[in-house]
Amino acid sequence: MAARLRTKYKKEIVPELNKKFKFSSIMQVPRLEKIVLNVGMGEAHTNPKALEAAVEELALITGQRPVKTKAKKSIAGFKIREGMSLGCMVTLRGDYMYEFLDRLVNVALPRVRDFKGVSEKGFDGRGNYNMSIKEQIIFPEIKVDKINTLYGINMTFVTNSKSNEEAYSLLAAFGMPYRNQK
């Protein structure tokens, strides 16, 4: 069974965006290619258990095992050596991506305290959107009483659109709650 948002994309969003931007083919309609989640933990070199907990929690959130990210260079001021594990990341594609986006928009973001919407300033000019959350506990898969450290998660939504406006419309059609909805 296909993910709910994938079905919505094919049946509702593609015709809507094709009509709005007047593409000559439906293959020109922007689509979500992947979502990359990244956790950077500065304390990982002094507390390896915190990184292991972050890996397990990110696996719970996404349904996919993250890969540990390693330092590219040694930095003496931060007591970091080349090859040290400093964080973890996961790349979501296909049904995992659509399921995660569905949970993020409909469950996790509304659980953020004093949530007014996500910023529109996260677009990079090439149709990709970056955002971050301050605490991982907004996801229902995370049990608050088993948390040792709070950390933020950076998310990058990669689309094949050519402009920010197309990517904005695509994510808004998926239900992304922007602060000043256009």
Curated annotation (Swiss-Prot):
GO (cellular component) term, any one:
cytosolic large ribosomal subunit
Any keyword Membrane?
A: no
Select a single GO molecular function from the record's annotations and give it: RNA binding
Keyword annotations of the record: Ribonucleoprotein, Ribosomal protein, RNA-binding, rRNA-binding, tRNA-binding
List membrane-spanning regions: none
Q: Which Pfam families match?
A: Ribosomal_L5, Ribosomal_L5_C
DNA damage is among the record's keywords: no
Do you know which PROSITE patterns this protein is assigned to? RIBOSOMAL_L5
Q: Which GO terms describe its biological process?
A: translation
Provide the function of this protein.
This is one of the proteins that bind and probably mediate the attachment of the 5S RNA into the large ribosomal subunit, where it forms part of the central protuberance. In the 70S ribosome it contacts protein S13 of the 30S subunit (bridge B1b), connecting the 2 subunits; this bridge is implicated in subunit movement. Contacts the P site tRNA; the 5S rRNA and some of its associated proteins might help stabilize positioning of ribosome-bound tRNAs.
Stated family: Belongs to the universal ribosomal protein uL5 family.
**What does the subunit section of this Swiss-Prot or TrEMBL entry state?**
Part of the 50S ribosomal subunit; part of the 5S rRNA/L5/L18/L25 subcomplex. Contacts the 5S rRNA and the P site tRNA. Forms a bridge to the 30S subunit in the 70S ribosome.
Q: What is this protein called?
A: Large ribosomal subunit protein uL5
Please report the organism this UniProt entry assigns to the protein. Leptospira interrogans serogroup Icterohaemorrhagiae serovar Lai (strain 56601)
